[in-house]
Amino acid sequence: MSANDAARGANHRRTALLHCVLVAVLAAVLALGSAAVAAEIRLADDSGRSVTLKQPAQRIISLAPHVTELLFAAGAGEHVVGTVEYSNYPAAAQRIPRIGDSAQLDLERIVALKPDLIVVWQNGNAQRQLDKLLRLGIPVFYNASRRLSDIARAIEQLGRLAGTETIASPTARAFVAREAGLRQRYARLALVTVFYQIWDKPLMTVNGDHLISDVIRLCGGQNVFADLKLLTPVISTEAVLAADPEAIGGVTAEPGQAGNLDGWKKWPRLKAVARDNLFVIPADLITRNTPRILDGAQQLCGHLEAARARRGR
């Protein structure tokens, strides 16, 4: 082989090697780009806004007790770095730093915690405060779940935002299955008319759009004030007496407390009183849009089942 042939062969090999290197580098760049795109999370929140995260959230602030509980249910509890007062479940939530409450937030504290995601309660946080948060440039995700059917979806959403789908998805499926089991057992039974008292002074109840009404329907009950326009309307004693519900439910802060329904015993001819159908359920189990709502639902279903059995009285 001549010297020229050897030189041409060497050049050819160098060119081929350079080509291979360039192809490998290009492939690596494309792979990195694809990974970056794949890691990006884009999700519509309950207000219809599109929320984009460059990667799963690692430092989350929750602005409602039920949102905190949902984040833990979705497997993202360890990523929650700040929350509001009354975030008391699970026990680990009680150790999370507080940044205010639904009425007043400590914006400086929020910024100092360096969150990469803030989850707010669209129906419960003051809009003026939310507007300030949006101006900070931190991704804000609105949760507005009101129905039982919204809870599993919220768990799935939060799991996706935090990259904890392997926990969130089975948790959501288990919730749906348990709800379906309760619905199958109770929803087709004879309707029981129900007045649900959430406050006594002034006397307040819920309309048909409230989560409590959804639970009442699940259990085969009918809210006697479902048609009122306000979500939590003030009503009169006379309106309750005229409706003459078969059962009266209430809320209590802690399990085992008596609640505030004793005042109805002044009217012994009221069906709920005459048949001993006054009951209370811990507020956190009947008013929070979390998996524990089904614990409260199970209690409520049991009370309505007892009310059916007492119709002969």
Which residue ranges define each predicted feature?
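Short helix-initiation/N-cap motifs at beta->coil->alpha
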Residues: A44-G48, I99-E108, G124, L228-T237
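A short, structured surface patch at a secondary-structure boundary
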Residues: Q58-L113, L117-N123, V224, T252
